[in-house]
């Protein structure tokens, strides 16, 4: 089965939870595109170019994973990338309602685009980019939550 999947997100920064889901998706699909949303309304700490580079570092060992920045509608990006599946992560029940609404909107806009939900490993289920940034901002050690390169980048941003 030839399936191209997109795992979209802001990834500001990419966490071990994201990396876990990327590995799971890479085992399920022939080709996985990490679609990094420009998303200026979220006021990301890292630029789009920085987020792309960090994701490339984190996924360098995965031959079937590609990292691409994008802006605009996700369904349009999926069509440009010839992807038929969107991969989304669910950490807790609280994520489900938003993801359910998003999946239905995407299906309405692009009926052939299917959403697949993956859950992270238990040890990553509480990690969020927001929490990681908050810990780093206050000088805390985030090395157990992110790749070493990401931890270094966060330290540089905090100083």
Swiss-Prot record:
Entry superkingdom: Bacteria
Any one of the GO CC terms: cytoplasm
Compartmental location: Cytoplasm
Cofactors, names only: Mg(2+)
Matches recorded under Gene3D superfamilies: HUPs (3.40.50.620)
One Pfam family from the record: CTP_transf_like
UniProt keyword list: ATP-binding, Coenzyme A biosynthesis, Cytoplasm, Magnesium, Nucleotide-binding, Nucleotidyltransferase, Transferase
Functional summary from the UniProt entry: Reversibly transfers an adenylyl group from ATP to 4'-phosphopantetheine, yielding dephospho-CoA (dPCoA) and pyrophosphate.
PANTHER family: PHOSPHOPANTETHEINE ADENYLYLTRANSFERASE (PTHR21342:SF1)
Subunit structure and binding partners: Homohexamer.
Protein name: Phosphopantetheine adenylyltransferase
Species of provenance: Shewanella halifaxensis (strain HAW-EB4)
Gene: coaD
């Amino acid at each position: 089965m030839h399936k191209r999947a997109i795992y979209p997100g802001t990834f500001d920064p990419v966490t071990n939870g994201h990396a876990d889901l990327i590995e799971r998706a890479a085992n399920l699909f022939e080709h996985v595109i990490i679609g990094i949303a420009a998303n200026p309304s979220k006021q990301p700490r890292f630029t789009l170019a920085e987020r792309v580079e960090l994701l490339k570092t984190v996924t360098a060992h995965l031959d079937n994973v590609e990292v691409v920045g994008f802006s605009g509608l996700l369904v349009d990006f999926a069509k440009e990338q010839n992807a038929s599946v969107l991969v989304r992560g669910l950490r807790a029940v609280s994520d489900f309602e938003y993801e359910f609404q998003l999946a239905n909107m995407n299906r309405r806009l692009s009926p052939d685009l299917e959403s697949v939900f993956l859950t992270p490993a238990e040890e990553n289920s509480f990690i969020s980019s927001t929490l990681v940034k908050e810990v780093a901002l206050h000088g805390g050690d985030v090395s157990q939550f992110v790749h070493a390169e990401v931890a270094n980048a966060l330290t540089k941003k905090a100083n």
